[in-house]
Swiss-Prot record:
Disulphide bond pairs: 39-112, 66-198, 87-125
Organism: Capra hircus
Gene responsible for this protein: IL12A
Subcellular compartments: Secreted
Any Gene Ontology CC annotation: extracellular space
Chief localisation class: secreted
Residues making up the signal peptide according to the UniProt record: 1-25
Record family assignment: Belongs to the IL-6 superfamily.
GO molecular function, one term: cytokine activity
Name of the protein this chain belongs to: Interleukin-12 subunit alpha
Source taxonomy: Eukaryota, Metazoa, Chordata, Craniata, Vertebrata
Statement: the UniProt record of this protein carries the keyword Glycoprotein: yes
Function (record text): Heterodimerizes with IL12B to form the IL-12 cytokine or with EBI3/IL27B to form the IL-35 cytokine. IL-12 is primarily produced by professional antigen-presenting cells (APCs) such as B-cells and dendritic cells (DCs) as well as macrophages and granulocytes and regulates T-cell and natural killer-cell responses, induces the production of interferon-gamma (IFN-gamma), favors the differentiation of T-helper 1 (Th1) cells and is an important link between innate resistance and adaptive immunity.
Length: 221
């Protein structure tokens, strides 16, 4: 029989993937000890940072259709990464059974697993998370550069969020990875830029919840 914890995790990941409009204010219980604690700290910090940034943006841009119900949801990682699929628990990712072996392992350079040794599937998961973070980091930097040119200076990105993304990327340590996307080069329209910011923040918060749940799972495994 499949471990109940694995089934709960995959149910959550699939739900987050297909229902982006859900409210995600609560997190799954986490374990504070064991391997992966460092990256769990970073993922929790990232989730707090993006949640705070989104809340501030919704308050500042209340006339820009910045609520979850008003925006057009967009996933910039679609067809470019496969984090939900890559982060399936190994028990559910092999031959559709719960008898998968954990013997296959790789040596990783990151700090998300205390031993530095992890399964092939876990490495794929962490690499996909890194690519997600890198894509969003590039997009947020491009948007922030435009916002800083706005004479009104109505809103700008919280540097704490950008720092939180960078910290988790550094901990994952897949520096050689390339991402299949460059920041979009649109005309300098500050209204569209602010709407785009709202769209990205909502999407990234959902992804941050997924990442936090996955780090919690790895930490307690």
């Amino acid at each position: 029989m499949c471990p109940l914890r694995s089934l709960l995790l995959i149910s959550t990941l699939v739900l987050l993937h297909h229902l982006p409009h859900l409210s995600l204010g609560r997190s799954l219980p986490i374990t504070t000890a064991g391997p992966g604690r460092s990256c769990l700290d970073y993922s929790q910090n990232l989730l707090r940072a993006v949640s705070n940034t989104l809340q501030k943006a919704r308050q500042t841009l209340e006339f820009y259709s910045c609520t979850s119900e008003e925006i057009d949801h967009e996933d910039i990682t679609k067809d470019k990464t496969s984090t939900v699929e890559a982060c399936l628990p190994l028990e559910l990712a092999t031959n559709e059974s719960c008898l998968a072996s954990r013997e296959t392992s790789l040596i990783t350079n990151g700090h998300c697993l205390a031993s530095g040794k992890t399964s092939f599937m876990t490495t794929l998961c962490l690499r996909s998370i890194y690519k997600d973070l890198k894509m969003y980091h590039m997009e947020f930097q491009a948007i922030n550069a435009k916002l800083l040119m706005d004479p009104k200076r109505q809103v700008s990105l919280d540097q704490n969020m950008l720092a939180a993304i960078a910290e988790l990327m550094q901990a994952l340590n897949f520096d050689s990875e390339t991402v299949p996307q460059k920041p979009s080069l649109e005309e300098l329209d500050f209204y569209k830029t602010k709407v785009k910011l709202c769209i990205l923040l909502h999407a990234f918060r959902i992804r941050a919840v997924t990442i936090d749940r996955m780090m919690s799972y790895l930490s307690s495994s």
